[in-house]
Amino acid sequence: MFVFSHIMLPHHPYIFQSDGTLISDTEYFELQNETAYLSQLQFTNSKVLDVVKKLLAKDTQPIIVVQSDHGFRFNHDEITSDDYASMERSFSNFSAYYFPDITLTNNEQPLTLVNSFRILFNNNFGTDYELLENKIFISKNLFESENIAHILIP
């Protein structure tokens, strides 16, 4: 069985408190984005952990990959290559892998998401996909982008 799920949490709008209760309309407009984001992230993390625990209890050899599509983007600020803190915050993806009986080597530790499935297939299904170069792009407009991986990845 293969299941792919894109969970839209903790994306904006930030509507959940850390215990899963909905915030009030007043709180929605009063809370700072960072505070609201962290509360919703805590709630999301607890739900993801519940799912992972159920998968581990039900299946003896599950393959589990949990990833974010990007890091925290405060107010959806424009990201520029001269703002290191904004770049680091925005592109700090979360990646967690559970492959039964397999430990990834340092060369296989993904720095970006581009190789996630290549690593999964190579380690679990006998493939030999070459790992791609890590790249991170910011877009100045629809037709112009800049690779900033050299700035964020040592």
Q: Which residues does each PLM region occupy?
A:
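Catalytic domains that recognize anionic headgroups
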Residues: 1-154
